[in-house]
Regions:
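ATP/nucleoside-binding phosphotransfer catalytic cores, i.e., glycine-rich phosphate-binding loops
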Residues: 163, 168, 179-182, 230-303
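Gly/Ser-rich helix-loop-strand patches that form or flank binding pockets
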Residues: 91, 96-106, 113
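Short glycine/serine/threonine-rich phosphate/pyrophosphate-binding segments
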Residues: 31-32, 87-92, 200-205
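Gly/Ser/Thr-rich active-site loops/lids in small-molecule metabolic enzymes
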Residues: 184-188, 193-229
Length: 303
């Protein structure tokens, strides 16, 4: 069984799709109904529907579904339909990227910037089966914390890594290096290291630039900087960014990736951020450009 392959042209016909994973936001009300509706559309095209054990906790009966572990689901699925918002896609991206499985997001959240479809557009899932799609490959970050000679934290991020003080009453002092060469020292609440995908999230709210996905830059944006400092730095994806926190006044500093639980740093830790070896593959079936989506979701340029 082969996953849908990346396209060099704008469109290509996909091979036979046999299995589709449905990944719902299990913490959202009404998700059982959404799963059943999506499964009905997928089955109309002759494919089997995969759920993981976690999905059964929302009241779905296993009858008619293939119930797999997450790892087996990643191996078996031809593509994934994520039912939720951007947070659900971020959680799935880390799981799917090493297996190169494409993701089709169906928004049941708020802005849903990464989602391709709104829930009333479920039937457009059929375009994937008909070969009417493109794949948008999104750069990810590899984030690791080195403590002495030991890697004590490592993860991937589709949006951003955030290094931030744990108290609203303390400021942090962070030394930023690029390929081990000093760039600056940032005083403030912290720093956001973002992908182009994450440039329209927390980074944008902090005053960072909007970066189109194909640019593949790494941006470094201070959070509430103290004093006169640049609002952002842009680096090549081939660079390695290192953040060295300085600890004083009993400060606590955490690193978090894509909104996941923070990992507490200690004196002497080095946080390394670089382009990840994998990417997130987002299915597109509507043909919207990045800028039309930007205007739609963020109402930029509208009266």
């Amino acid at each position: 069984m082969e996953h849908l392959q990346s396209m060099t042209n704008k469109q290509k016909k996909c091979g036979t799709i046999r299995k589709v994973l449905l990944w719902p936001n299990t913490g959202k009300k009404g998700m059982a109904f959404a799963v059943r509706q999506a499964a009905e559309v997928i089955r109309e095209f002759g494919a089997q529907v995969i759920l993981t054990d976690l999905a059964l906790t929302i009241g779905i009966k296993p009858d008619g579904f293939l119930v797999y572990s997450v790892q087996k689901a990643m191996i078996e699925a031809d593509f994934i339909v994520v039912l939720g918002g951007d947070g659900t896609i971020l959680a799935m991206a880390q799981q799917a990227a090493p297996y190169h499985v494409p993701i089709l997001g169906v928004n049941l959240g708020h802005v849903g910037f990464m989602s391709e479809l709104e829930f009333p557009e479920l039937r457009l899932i059929g375009r994937v089966f008909n070969g009417e799609y493109t794949i948008d490959e999104r750069m990810m970050l590899d984030v690791e914390v080195l403590r002495g000679e030991e890697i004590v934290y490592r993860t991937m991020a589709l949006n951003e890594a955030i290094i931030k003080t744990g108290s609203i009453f303390r400021i942090s002092l962070l030394d930023i290096l690029c390929d081990r060469e000093p760039v600056c020292s940032l005083h403030g609440d912290g720093v956001i290291i973002s992908t182009p995908t994450g440039s329209t999230a927390y980074s944008l709210a902090a005053g960072g630039p909007v970066i189109e996905p194909s640019a593949e830059n790494i941006s470094v944006v201070p959070i509430c900087p103290h004093g006169v400092q640049p609002r952002s730095y842009l680096f090549s994806p081939h660079r390695e960014i290192c953040i060295q926190p300085r600890f004083f006044n009993d400060a606590t500093i955490f690193v978090s990736s894509d909104g996941r639980r923070g990992f507490e740093l200690t004196d002497g830790d080095h946080v390394f951020v670089r382009k990840a070896p994998f990417c997130t593959r987002l299915l597109r079936v509507k043909g919207n450009s990045f800028y039309s989506l930007l205007n739609e979701k963020l109402t930029i340029g509208r009266n």
